[in-house]
């Protein structure tokens, strides 16, 4: 498998994977990614800002993720817990895996590659949030040694479970 930056010619593959995740969330009654986000505009911005990544298998895009540095004001206030560290951190966003590759260790492969990028950028803290009903994501995070830290609220007021890992 090859982990690399997302390119413009990947947009349709990435959108297809994200739409698959949106459909899964809808079927499972998970109110995440149900209001038009993320969309093509989001992916283009990720590409332009060099924060979008894909995982390929045999030249086919099978997963997508975004990684941002420099913090996020939404993460400043955490409820019913606390972050593991106050150090500078990276945020993992928009993790999605093609349906045919779910439960095959692909998300773990994404995480290990993200950790390498963080280390290269002298960042040892990684944060991520997910919906309370997104049990597969919570399980993947725990499997990859992320610790549950508490609850944050997105700009639209949506509640998310917050996780952090120190690498």
Where are these regions (language model features)?
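Conserved active-site alpha-helix within GNAT-family acetyltransferase domains
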Residues: 108, 120, 132-150
């Amino acid at each position: 498998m090859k982990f690399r930056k997302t390119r413009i010619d990947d947009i349709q593959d990435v959108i297809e994977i994200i739409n698959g995740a949106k459909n899964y969330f809808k079927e499972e009654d998970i109110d995440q990614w149900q209001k038009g986000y993320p969309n093509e505009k989001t992916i283009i911005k990720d590409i332009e800002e060099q924060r979008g990544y894909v995982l390929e298998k045999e030249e086919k895009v099978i997963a997508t993720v975004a990684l941002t540095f420099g913090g996020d004001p939404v993460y400043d206030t955490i409820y019913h817990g606390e972050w593991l560290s106050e150090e500078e951190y990276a945020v993992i966003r928009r993790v999605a895996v093609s349906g045919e590759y779910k439960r095959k260790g692909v998300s773990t492969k994404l995480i290990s590659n993200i950790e390498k990028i963080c280390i290269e950028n002298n960042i040892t803290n990684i944060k991520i949030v997910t919906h309370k009903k997104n049990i597969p994501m919570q399980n993947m995070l725990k499997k990859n040694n992320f610790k549950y830290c508490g609850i944050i609220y997105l700009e639209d007021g949506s509640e998310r479970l917050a996780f952090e890992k120190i690498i």
